[in-house]
C-alpha cells in the first residue's frame, strides 16, 4: 500500500502542512480541499494516483495541521491562498502541475490558472463542484453558499468522537462517503481535542472572514483567461454549483463537464467511477 509522507514547510511566513504521495520525479498533481476541510480528504484519490503521479495535498492555513493566522482579516482570502499555493510549488521546485480542487480549492485553481503571471503553472484543472460565480444574482444568494455561511464561523463542540462523526454524517451527507471506515477516517482527520476535553472540527473559526472578501466569489474574468484543459465535476443535486452556472461554464471550448448522480456538494472523489473520470482526464 502506498503511504503518504507528512511534511511541514514555511511558505510566505506561514507554516503549511501537506501530505506527499508518490515519486517526486513524476508529474505533480496538487489536490486542494474545500473551505473547512483539509488535505486528507483526498487520501483515497491520492493513493490511486500515486502510482503514476507525485501528489501534494496541502492543508490551507487555518485548517488541519497548518498554522492559524494572527491576521485573519487579511490572510483568510483566496488571493493569499493562491499566493501560498504558488509559494509551495516554488519552494518544492515544481514548475507545472495538474490541479484537483474541491469547492474552495477549485476557486484557488481558477485564480492561479486565470492569472497571466501564473496561468502556465497549471496544465490540467479539475474543478469539483465549484463555479466561477453566479449567473444573475450575487454569489452570496446561492443556497449552498448561504448554508455554508450560516455555520462556518461557529464550529460545534461535542463531548465524543461519535457525536462529531454523526454531525458530519448530517452536514456532509451529500459527499457520498460509502462506508463506516470512510466516515471514521473523515472524522479522525477533521477533529481536535479542546482544552475542556471536548472535541470539535479542526479549523480556525475566523476562516469565516473569507466572506468579507466578496470579490473572491466572482471569478468570471479569471475563468475567461484560463488556457488549461478543464474538467468541471458537478454533484447532480448540488446547491453550491447551480446548473445554469455549470452550463455557462461548459460553453468555454476547453471545458468539459460531468455530473455525478445522486450526490451534492461536493463529491468525495472516492469511488472507482469518479477516480476513473479523473485518471482519464489527467493523462
Residue ranges, per PLM feature:
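Alpha/beta-hydrolase fold catalytic core
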Residues: 1-30, 51-53, 94-95, 123, ...
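Conserved HGGG/HGGXW glycine-rich cap/lid loop of the alpha/beta-hydrolase fold
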Residues: 14-68
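Active-site loop/oxyanion-hole signature of alpha/beta-hydrolase fold enzymes
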Residues: 44, 57-100, 104
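Short glycine-enriched nucleophile-adjacent loop
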Residues: 106-117, 125
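Flexible "cap/lid" loop of the alpha/beta hydrolase fold
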Residues: 123-161
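Conserved alpha/beta-hydrolase catalytic His-Asp/Glu region
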Residues: 155-213
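Conserved serine/cysteine hydrolase catalytic core
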Residues: 192-250
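Catalytic histidine-centered segment of alpha/beta-hydrolase-like enzymes
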Residues: 263-273
